[in-house]
């Protein structure tokens, strides 16, 4: 049987949003203000964020990810009948400080030790 000699891992690359960072944590922070629509807003926000990224790429109408994030939130809020500019601002600010998933710190420490 052939022995496989693997080199030590020197670099690892991750998709940050949705893999390391919980994209729904922004809406969770403002659950009290979003009320029963919190989950729907968060899910639609993420769905539109991905769809807008794909569509703009296909149409070669590139904008930065932050613009996509804002446009997607606007759609999600409007679709849920929410017209609150301060809530919009606070949700976008929360997106700058997304929580990581609980297992991420330990996993990254373990990978660092490899």
Model-derived features: positions:
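A metal-dependent, Asp-based hydrolase signature
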Residues: 33, 39, 53-89
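Short, acidic loop-to-helix structural element flanking the phosphoryl-transfer center
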Residues: 66-67, 85-114
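A structural signal for alpha-helical segments
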Residues: 4, 60-64, 99
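A broad detector of the eukaryotic-type serine/threonine protein kinase catalytic domain
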Residues: 50-54, 96
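Residues in soluble alpha-helical coiled-coils and helical-bundle/repeat scaffolds
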Residues: 22, 36, 82, 96-99
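Active-site neighborhood of HAD-like aspartate-dependent phosphohydrolases
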Residues: 2-50
